[in-house]
Amino acid sequence: TGAEPYDPDHTCVVVHTGGTTGSPKGVMLTDVDFNSIAQQFGAYEKLFRRGQKLMNIMPPFIAYGYACGVHLPLVLGLTVIIIPNLDPEKLGALIWKYKPEHMFGVPAHYQQMASSLLLKNKDLSFIRNYAAGGDAITVGAEQSVNDFLAAHGVEYGLAKGYGMTEVSSAATAASGLANKVGSVGIPLVNTLVSVFEPGTDTELPIGERGELCISGPAIMKGYYGKPAETAALLRHHSDGRVWAHTGDVGYMDEDGFVFLDSRIKRLIIRHDGFKVFPSMIENVISRHPAVQQCSVVGCTDKDHVQGRLPFVYVVLDPEGDKKKRQIVRELRQLCKEELPEYVQPVSYKFISEMPMTPVGKVDYRKLEEEITPRDY
């Protein structure tokens, strides 16, 4: 019998969202969605060459892990090395064993790589494109990873990307020399990314913060069995296009690079209406040499009937020797020097490690739930 007729709207998989800011939903992704991701990354021909290796450390049952870690490399003729149930402590050994030119992971993976004792004096010049997605990375953490890569003979810094399950994982990419520290790259070749007044189709000018929206060939078919939720995310604008409203706040610079601030749901709104972006604080605190990782969440404003205040969780560098009280004083001074008064954190809490979701994202909801009145 002949092949089945081609149906561009055929649902290939139903993938569940990560659920860090809401209940998980089944996302229907089509054959065209996945193929378009591979075809768009194929434009980076100087980075991806047939016969190279890609080590997939992401779960292949999420959109990021399958689209970028399995389908994309196979379409481009790469060999895929799948690492099931990755033990982060063994990441350095796996990189040295397989020497993959390419890897897609989350920021925590690259921080783990940069702290690997096994890789400390190794030549890693075989690395071509190691990319971070799935979660935000602070400027301080990105610079630390870039310093590690440069010191080990790697030509390019950490590549970053941005997307969501609803757009088949990727809408922007920063790789090779097309990269700016702090950005998540430029839109993929057939994808439009723009900034709108949240919840509307009013486009904002360059440099102004608003809701990041995406239009292109990799947008989902819809949420399985949830037409209302589908209509809320996929909206028809006056330009005739369908735009996915991401719920993320960011802006675009004059060179077309996209900068991500935070989820709209992560915004901390004070009692006086001022809005605090967690990333503003995280990017300052992460530059302190004693800080290995940090996350900012909102806590109840005990002095007012409404509003929330920024609260900082900090994971310290285990090799540091300063006392916590001294570090807090230095962090407060750093924030005072570089941030407006209304953005100042109300308190700092030191923890041994960040709680993570099963797909490697910081579990911000759990962090918020663990704050007690005694903490601030």
Q: Where do the model's predicted regions map?
A:
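Conserved beta-loop-beta connector loops within the AMP-binding
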Residues: 180, 194-213, 251-255, 321-328, ...
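Gly/Ser/Thr-rich phosphate-binding loop
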Residues: 101-105, 114-181, 192
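ATP phosphate-binding P-loop of adenylate-forming
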Residues: 9-27, 38, 42, 159-162
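Conserved AMP-binding/adenylation subdomain of ANL enzymes
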Residues: 35-53, 61-104, 108, 112, ...
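AMP-binding/adenylate-forming catalytic domain of the ANL superfamily
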Residues: 339-362
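AMP-binding/adenylate-forming catalytic core of the ANL superfamily
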Residues: 103, 216, 221-222, 231-232, ...
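Conserved pre-ATP/AMP-binding loop-to-beta segment of ANL
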Residues: 1-16, 23, 46-53
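Conserved ATP/PPi-binding loop(s) of AMP-dependent carboxylate-activating enzymes
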Residues: 186-190, 202-235, 274-276
